[in-house]
UniProtKB/Swiss-Prot annotation:
PANTHER family reported in the protein's UniProt record: COBYRIC ACID SYNTHASE (PTHR21343:SF1), DETHIOBIOTIN SYNTHETASE (PTHR21343)
Biological function: Catalyzes amidations at positions B, D, E, and G on adenosylcobyrinic A,C-diamide. NH(2) groups are provided by glutamine, and one molecule of ATP is hydrogenolyzed for each amidation.
Recorded GO MF terms: ABC-type vitamin B12 transporter activity; catalytic activity
UniProt-listed InterPro entries: Class_I_gatase-like (IPR029062), CobQ/CobB/MinD/ParA_Nub-bd_dom (IPR002586), CobQ_GATase1 (IPR033949), CobQ_N (IPR047045), CobQ_synth (IPR004459), GATase_3 (IPR011698), P-loop_NTPase (IPR027417)
Domain GATase cobBQ-type stretches: 248-435
Recorded metabolic or biological pathway in which this protein acts: Cofactor biosynthesis; adenosylcobalamin biosynthesis
Alphabetical GO biological process terms: cobalamin biosynthetic process
This protein's UniProt keywords: Cobalamin biosynthesis, Glutamine amidotransferase
Name of this protein: Cobyric acid synthase
Length: 487
């Protein structure tokens, strides 16, 4: 049983992508491999079959391994709910919310959960492919580290270091990171991968030769800059658009400070008939066919921000002119009369007025609802599947006209009497081809195409594995993974 870890010189260096690529590449070799990330800080999450919660990137990596997502793949998940605090999720379950100082002390306990999960995976799979977090050279975070070299030292595993050349300074990033590690940590780094290179590789070769001579470590390969790869982002919002045709539906997503699960909108971003725009602070909401209020980790605080930015008035104007409006999860809660947080789960205890567009109110409760679900969309009776991640319980007459009839007998969400507003707790609403097409037709795109988003994701995973074959030193990678060429 082998554990191999990918660490990066910075955030967004390409760790998640490389782990996904290596997982599918190993699977092609006939090797049973499992993804693992000790600690993830992200507001994009997925629900496992047993009702736990892990980072979205690990769910994609599980797909690359053709495995069902499991809480052991990401034993510690931190979901920021303020500038200094986060909800701490261990083995898929919310433990508590902590500020940074309290969590630093808690990491001793968190490390026990990390090592227990890793050991279970190590016993079950020949290769555990691990993703680090941020950079291993953050001096202020090195004490008690459980996400990078602290974990690698604890389980005695080799490390690949990846850096993004597109942002500039790649040699400084690699050499500087290495210099800031301890001698034993430096010895763990078995090679470098340079990511997002564009241009003539021959012009880069002198730098690669210098890097190998300077560090005594091999460059395992140079991955090209890929412009049309569309796997879910771990945390940053991906604003890239697929090429659109002439007839498009204009969709606006207001970006609030604690937006969560914005990967909900990836299928729309890729849809050839949708012009998706994320609107940030200081930007007015332009005319659109559809506005979507996304999920939020701090609904009341984000409601306040929405009003401060004048977006509540823009939404009211949008509805007066006949536009359509969707609220997903936290967005659903914002559309009601009130949001109550008596326990202070998302900040100071109290209540906030919602937008009052649907006749219900929400109370935030300590027990989070986590489940994968399927059912029938009220629009066109289209099949729909997705997942719930929410602490709120919503009650009121507005729910008498549900958005979704779930297969387990429950109703979800609401559709307004005039048919302009749809609210749902379901994430992943647009991933199903039939449900996505039905929603786009409802929003005004009469000839909406059905796009197989799952097939697009699978295609991209295969492309990543191709890049490993074409651009990395696969023989050295096999050695690091402890597998033979004919495995």
């Amino acid at each position: 049983m082998t554990t191999l870890m990918v660490q990066g010189t910075t955030s967004d260096a390409g760790k998640s992508t490389l782990v996904t690529a290596l997982c599918r590449w190993l699977l092609r070799q006939g090797v049973a491999v499992v993804p693992f990330k000790p600690q993830n800080m992200a507001l994009n999450s997925a629900v496992t079959a047993d009702g736990g919660e892990i980072g979205r990137a690990q769910a994609v990596q599980a797909q690359a391994c053709r495995l069902a997502p499991h809480t052991d793949m990401n034993p510690v998940l931190l979901k920021p709910n303020s500038d200094t605090g986060a909800q701490v999720i261990v083995h898929g379950r919310a433990v508590t919310s902590m500020n940074a100082v309290a969590y630093h002390d808690y990491k001793v306990i968190a490390m026990q959960a990390v090592l227990a999960s890793h050991e279970r995976l190590r016993q079950a799979y020949p290769v555990v492919m691990v993703e680090g977090a941020g950079s291993p050279a953050e001096i202020n975070l090195r004490a008690g580290d459980i996400a990078n070299m602290g974990f690698a030292e604890a389980v005695d595993c080799p490390v690949i270091l990846i850096a993004d050349i597109n942002r500039g300074g790649v040699f400084a990033h690699l050499v500087g990171t290495l210099e800031l590690l301890s001698p034993s940590e430096q010895a763990r780094v078995k090679g470098f991968v340079i990511n997002r290179f564009r241009g003539d590789i021959a012009l880069l070769q002198p730098g690669l030769d210098w890097l190998e001579q300077r560090t005594g470590k091999p460059v395992l390969g140079v991955l090209p800059y890929v412009t049309d790869l569309h796997l879910e982002a771990e945390d940053a919002i991906d604003v890239r658009q697929a090429v659109k045709g002439e007839r498009v539906l204009k969709v606006i997503v207001p970006v609030l400070p604690r937006i969560s699960n914005h990967t909900d909108f990836d299928p729309l971003r890729l849809h050839p008939q949708v012009d998706l725009q994320f609107i940030g602070p200081g930007q007015p909401i332009p005319p659109a066919d559809l506005i979507i209020l996304p999920g939020s980790k701090s609904v009341r605080a984000d409601l306040s921000q929405l009003r401060e930015r004048g977006w509540d008035s823009a939404i009211a104007r949008h509805l007066r002119y006949g536009g359509k409006l969707i609220g997903i999860c936290g967005g659903l809660q914002m559309l009601g009369h009130e949001v109550h947080d008596p326990l202070g789960l998302e900040g100071a205890a109290g209540s906030s007025a919602g937008l009052g567009l649907l006749d219900y109110s929400t109370v935030l409760e300590a027990e989070k609802q986590l489940r994968n679900v399927a059912g029938t969309l009220g629009l066109e009776q289209a099949p729909v599947s997705g997942y719930e991640i929410h602490a709120g319980v919503t009650h009121g007459p507005g729910l008498e006209h549900p958005a979704v009839q779930l297969d387990d007998g429950r109703n979800d969400g609401a559709i307004s009497a005039d048919g302009q507003i749809l609210a749902t707790y379901l994430h992943g609403l647009f991933e199903g081809s039939q449900s996505c097409a039905a929603l786009l037709r409802w929003a005004g795109l009469a000839d909406a195409q059905a796009i197989d988003y799952e097939a697009l994701r699978e295609r991209d995973i295969e492309r990543l594995a191709d890049l490993v074959e074409q651009h990395l030193d696969t023989e050295r990678l096999r050695q690091l993974c402890g597998v033979t060429a004919d495995a």
